[in-house]
Amino acid sequence: MPISLRLAWIPPLLTLAACATASPPPTATSTAETNSVPASIAGQSAYGLFLAGQSAINTGEGAAAAGYFTRAAGAADGADAPFVETHAFTAALLAGDIKGAAAIAPVSDDDVVLQRLAFLTVAVDDLASGKAAKAHTLLGQVGAPYNAAGSLLTPFAAAKAGDGEAAISMPVIANDPVASYFASLDQGILFEHLRRYDEAETAFRALIVHGDPGALASLNLGAFLERRGRWADAVATYDQALSRAPGDPTLLAAKARAASRHDAPAMESLDASAAEALTALSSTLVVRKQSEAALAYLRLALRLDPERDAAWLLVGDILTDIGDKDAARVAYLAPKPGQPDYVAARDKLAWSLQADDRKDDALELARTAVTAEPASREAATNLADLLRADERYSESAAILDKLIADEGDTPDWRLLYMRAVDNQLSDHWPEAENDLNLALKERPDEPELLNFLGYSWIDRGEKLHEALAMVQKAVDADPKSGAMTDSLGWGYYRLGDYQTAVEKLELAVSLEAGDPDINNHLGDAYWRVGRRIEARFQWSRVLTLEPDAKLRAEVEAKLRNGLGPISGS
């Protein structure tokens, strides 16, 4: 659903945004035109421009919609004007035109919630434009539901306005642990900006003692120590964080930099640090399924720091989820080679193209990322994943061969797992089995490995009792997995315990109702216990679940002829 039509988080816009089409201005007659007028032929009247904006929204063109609504707002008068201006403001905000949104923000609106969003938008634009004192005043008028954002931005506005004491005054944020964490983190950042170094270090260390989620406090403290020339202390800080998050690439890179004793990272600007806080808030909103609010905060963050790649990735993810693929791809193009998020962004962009069946373009993009970042395992494994999706298994395995060889005697079990998939799908089972056994030596309790090898043995009719024990262990570790429960049920089926198989496979279908293989297995089990009508129902259902050609042919044969007599397990 297009972004500007799902603004239920802004109460004044509920009547405009609660469904897949918004209403025309109050004085206009609602007709089918509101859903079908092409933007290219819309008139220049306020109503014509409004309809053009509606059309752009309905086709997922958020930026174009914002332009039309803004022009409509300029042309509207009388009773229609507030309605159109509200559309123009929210469309511009969500499309990322913060300057445009600030220029038409309804700061005098009668609805206090919409007015507070307007204050927040104008304040961010003022802060980014160097009008810190004005921004600080406006942020004092931002309340619920935007109070966390306003509270986090206020100290940065105070610091930019030259009020150091106000800048280090800890904001009071209730019932929002993420915002409270960033308020404390930002206090350390602001102490450093104010050259109160002892207090900055104390603030960072206090956060680390209390858990340091994401190692953000450790990274900030380490960078702070590097800037002070305290290289050994910085390395120790990163080591401590790595003990909690072994292999974290950001921490490893920071440690290597500190160990080299040069190129200490520059202190981020106040605007960039404020943008980081807004980006963190948006992440929590995404988890809460409040995508539009998250997108608004991300757009505001990018007004403060246009090069905040983490924000661009989240923008791309949200736009992908709501169907604005072109805008999402623009967001994924923002991170540049050499930046930490470049490979992740290219991976997402490649899979976006893959989803549109642009397979060659996706592979070209993935190969470009490998060329740009030859040391990146993530770039290489993404290329392997795309090749596997295209059923080019030997090429995928060849990439993994090199990665596994580079890791020496103890390669990452995940690489072995992926190569096993390639080998199994290309009918090289002995090689796949060997990789799975090697991976299990490294991770003997990993449910995915136990299920893969166990199910493969079951399906091949090999080592059935050992295999059943393996998949039972996998199910015990992940009882909500429909795939693993299916493996268990299929194991009982192959052992001839059809009644237990039915029980397990019914549970598997309840956990993953849309899987054609699980439904097929349940149909077979029903048949073996004499429940023929239910068996045919399950097989018929398989045909509605997009089975591959091989499974479709198998099921169609069973619907015609049923299952033959048991020839052994």
Predicted regions and their residues:
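Bacterial signal peptide processing site
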Residues: 20-22
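Bacterial N-terminal signal peptides that target proteins for export
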Residues: 1-9
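Alpha-solenoid helical repeat scaffolds
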Residues: 24, 34-58, 67-569
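C-terminal motif of bacterial Sec signal peptides marking the signal peptidase cleavage site
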Residues: 16-18
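Residue-level signal for mature regions of secreted extracellular proteins and peptides
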Residues: 12-13
